[in-house]
């Protein structure tokens, strides 16, 4: 009771907010809120409170109440950060140049391979407790630092343990196509075969993932490879999410829409064609400004996207090397 303002009231039950409607934020001043069995049951102004039986009464004393943050793009499970690469960045090397030198994702994969599942879980739980304390109530966590069947499954099992251990809503995404493993250098097609024919069936057999993701961008996976992986995943009941257009206009947006992806994420490199492709689509553009800031890249054209009537989601891209 005695809440100065409840922010983010949505009484119509809509699941999607786009364009100019994103500027309409429902609020209620001088309010009370009733929770039952972990869910909000009722709310109203203090002058309508009346006599409500409650096991516990919390006096907000004029505080404000905000929804928890839904962080829909993270890489929280990893074995140590890549702080040494920050020196490369400030000395002028790009993300792609660091990756070509064996850094970036491949660096994280090497370290994860040497780390046990229990240690990965312990490290990740520290990060989960940190984001929960800062207001995150729902989080998506990706694999993608394994790049082998065994290590990808290890990551996803850690995510499952996290889901079973915390009150947050946790969703798991299989990202075996984050980069081509060192063992498959020069044999990218064979690595895509591995993802489609071995990794995906193993992930599905254990029920370890809610979604599948592909890094569809210059120097990583092509549109054709992305479509093949996503179609294989769909047959196993996994819906798509895509890393797209971070480094170049890659075609990732268009293949995401064509494959009915839940979201296309990053989008630092967007043109009119990409914005038009998203108009009327179910696919949600997701922006990761922390990564753009850390990497010294241009921010995605959020205002142009909203003015075109698109919905825009924000996520942290919490990861060991670029956000």
Task: Annotate each predicted stretch with a short phrase.
Residues 67, 129, 227, 231, ...:
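Alpha-helical segments flanking ligand/cofactor-binding loops in enzyme cores
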Residues 106-124, 129-130, 137-250:
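Metal-coordinating catalytic core of metallo-dependent amide/deamination hydrolases
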Residues 1, 56-59, 70, 173, ...:
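Hydrophobic/aromatic beta-strand patches that form the interior of the parallel beta-sheet core
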Residues 76-77, 246, 320:
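Short active-site segment of divalent metal-dependent hydrolases/proteases
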Residues 1-51:
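N-terminal metal-binding scaffold of metallo-dependent hydrolase/deaminase domains
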Residues 239-240, 249-323:
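Active-site-adjacent C-terminal substructures of enzyme catalytic domains
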Residues 56, 60-123:
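Metal-associated gating/positioning segment near the N- to mid-region
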Residues 3, 33, 38, 62, ...:
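Divalent metal-coordination and catalytic microenvironments
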């Amino acid at each position: 009771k005695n809440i100065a303002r409840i922010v983010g009231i949505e009484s119509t039950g809509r699941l999607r907010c786009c364009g100019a409607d994103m500027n309409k934020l429902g609020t209620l001043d001088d309010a009370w809120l009733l929770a039952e069995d972990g869910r909000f049951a009722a709310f109203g102004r203090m002058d309508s409170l009346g006599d409500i039986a409650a096991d516990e009464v919390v006096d907000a004393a004029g505080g404000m109440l905000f929804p928890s943050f839904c962080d829909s793009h993270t890489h929280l499970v990893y074995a140590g950060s890549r702080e040494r690469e920050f020196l490369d960045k400030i000395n002028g090397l790009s993300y792609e140049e660091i990756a070509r030198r064996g850094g970036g994702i491949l660096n994280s994969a090497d370290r994860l391979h040497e780390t046990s599942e229990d240690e990965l879980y312990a490290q990740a739980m520290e990060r989960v407790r940190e984001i929960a304390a800062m207001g995150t109530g729902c989080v998506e966590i990706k694999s993608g630092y394994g790049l082998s069947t065994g290590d990808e499954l290890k990551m996803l099992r850690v995510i499952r343990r996290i889901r079973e251990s915390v009150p947050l809503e946790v969703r798991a995404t299989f990202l075996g196509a984050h980069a081509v493993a060192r063992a498959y250098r020069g044999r990218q097609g064979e690595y895509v075969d591995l993802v489609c024919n071995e990794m995906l069936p193993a992930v599905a057999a254990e029920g370890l993932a809610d979604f599948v993701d592909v890094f569809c961008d210059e120097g990583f996976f092509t549109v054709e490879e992305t479509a093949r992986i996503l179609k294989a995943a769909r047959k196993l009941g996994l819906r798509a999410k895509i890393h797209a257009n971070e480094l170049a206009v890659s075609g990732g947006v268009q293949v995401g829409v064509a494959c009915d992806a839940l979201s296309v994420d990053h989008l630092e490199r967007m043109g009119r064609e990409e914005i038009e492709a998203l108009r009327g689509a179910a696919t949600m553009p997701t922006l990761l400004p922390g990564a753009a800031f850390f990497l010294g890249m241009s921010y995605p054209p959020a205002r142009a996207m909203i003015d075109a009537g698109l919905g825009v989601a924000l996520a942290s891209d919490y990861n060991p090397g670029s956000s």
